[in-house]
Amino acid sequence: MITVYDKIVHKKLNGVDIVNIGITGSIACGKSTVSNYLRDKGYTIIDADKLGHTALTDNEVREKLEKSFGLRIIENNEISREKLGKLVFGNEENLKILNSIVHPYIRKQILQLQEIHSDERLVFLDIALLFEAGFENLVEKIIVVHVDEKIQLARLMSRNSLSKEQAMFRIESQMSSNDKSKLGNYVINNSNTKEETYRQIDLILDELERGVIKNDECIRN
């Protein structure tokens, strides 16, 4: 289990710690299930995947991508995610180039959104590549959503209409669910029913909320 990272700048609201929580997990493990449940409960969810899509419309990002990959990634005067994806998927060098351009934009946007929501006690960051992108220092606690390998494979094949070989290739191209679980403060096993997943989320929320209240009490005392 990991502890609070030394690069984090802690903020306080009326003397209370504001906690940014990362939600991560490997492909087809069910991060969206967790995020949607938290969103329905009224918590703010910063969606890194959406920020990644927005990055492709940013003029500075687009200019750098065109310079690196050429006009072959352009379709209808926009960057084609499909064409860009074909260039980077399975190509480590191209993927590094893409990440070096897009990740700084995403990091900047996350920090801005965390600042906007700095009046809230708990803010959640939904990000698949939390560890791979080196964004751990943007959060104080990490929730890893985990599923059993066989279930992960079956879900990915069904969701993306992939063959077993294609799905395995995508799973193996990322950090494994087991490895990510070792780095989390909390692990949600999403292998069973949604109700069971929700129960685990509620337990974590209770601990997080109680922790914030406890910090407040310590400060006031």
For each predicted feature, which ranges?
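Walker A/P-loop
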Residues: 32
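Hydrophobic anchor at the beta1->P-loop junction of P-loop NTPases
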Residues: 23
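P-loop (Walker A) phosphate-binding loop of NTP-binding proteins
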Residues: 26, 38
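ATP-dependent NMP and nucleoside kinases share a basic, alpha-helical "lid"
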Residues: 109-117, 122-159
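Small-molecule kinase domains that catalyze NTP-dependent phosphoryl transfer to phosphate-bearing small molecules
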Residues: 106-109, 137-138, 158, 162-207, ...
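ATP-binding Walker
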Residues: 29
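Extreme N-terminal, non-catalytic leader segments
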Residues: 1-19
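ATP-dependent small-molecule kinase phosphotransfer cores
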Residues: 50-121
